[in-house]
Amino acid sequence: FDSFWFVQQWPPAVCSFQKSGSCPGSGLRTFTIHGLWPQGSGTSLTNCPQGSPFDITKISHLQSQLNTLWPNVLRANNQQFWSHEWTKHGTCSESTFNQAAYFKLAVDMRNNYDIIGALRPHAAGPNGRTKSRQAIKGFLKAKFGKFPGLRCRTDPQTKVSYLVQVVACFAQDGSTLIDCTRDTCGANFIF
């Protein structure tokens, strides 16, 4: 792997695309961690064969922070989500970050990359109104020094686009922010 995508999700938007059933994250009003995804040559590396199995005991010291910062917003089972993310993504960076280090890295990234805190001074926080991709990217670059990636989903009925994820891109060391080069949002979206 040569870099990371640190992906935070906006639970109200994520939940709005769920077709049925309850969504435990619908009431959350802060960005939560979706995952820390190793990248290689511009592609997400997944399901790496040499990885070790998820072991909750290796991250028990982080569990209270993970419950807050990395909840399963779709189903009330956080450990299942962490296991999925470790197996699908984390194992691909295990040569550098073992399981405990991987989850600690994600917690540290979330604590240092506070999206709402960066947008609030610009009155650009979540209010269900139209936002400009250029403005949001600019506010986040002004705060953190590098451009994020913005990921949107479009409602198939209304054709309205909603911000669902913000990606912070990091070098292989997991601490050096780099510019993200990919967005899935158009010029404007609801947030």
UniProtKB/Swiss-Prot annotation:
Q: What is the effect of changing A106L?
A: Decreased thermostability (at 47-58 degrees Celsius)
Binding of RNA occurs at Q9, H34, N72, V73, R75, F81, H84, E85, K88, H89
- Resulting phenotype, F191A: Decreased thermostability (at 47-58 degrees Celsius)
Looking up InterPro entries in the UniProt record yields: Ribonuclease_T2_eukaryotic, RNase_T2-like, RNase_T2-like_sf, RNase_T2_His_AS_1, RNase_T2_His_AS_2
Q: Name one GO cellular component term.
A: extracellular region
Phenotype upon changing G145A:
Slightly decreased thermostability (at 47-58 degrees Celsius)
Q: Which UniProt keywords apply?
A: Disulfide bond, Endonuclease, Hydrolase, Lyase, Nuclease, Signal
Question: Which domain of life does the protein's organism represent?
Answer: Eukaryota
Q: What is the effect of changing Y102A?
A: Decreased thermostability (at 47-58 degrees Celsius)
**Catalytic reactions of this protein:** a ribonucleotidyl-ribonucleotide-RNA + H2O = a 3'-end 3'-phospho-ribonucleotide-RNA + a 5'-end dephospho-ribonucleoside-RNA + H(+)
Q: Which Pfam families match?
A: Ribonuclease_T2
Record's keyword annotation contains Transit peptide: no
EC number(s): the record gives 4.6.1.19
In this protein, the active site sits at: H34, E85, H89
Q: Where is this site: Involved in thermostability?
A: Y102, F103, A106, P126, G128, G145, L163, V166, F191
Q: Which GO terms describe its biological process?
A: RNA catabolic process
Which CDD domains does this chain map to?
RNase_T2_euk
Q: What does the UniProt entry list as the effect of changing N72S?
A: Altered substrate specificity from uridine specific to guanosine specific
In the record, the effect of L74A is given as: Decreased affinity for uridine (CpU substrate)
Q: Name one GO molecular function term.
A: RNA binding
Q: What is the effect of changing V166A?
A: Slightly decreased thermostability (at 47-58 degrees Celsius)
Q: What else is known?
A: Has a remarkably high specificity toward CpU, ApU, and UpU.
* Protein family (similarity comment): Belongs to the RNase T2 family.
Q: What is the protein name for this chain?
A: Ribonuclease MC
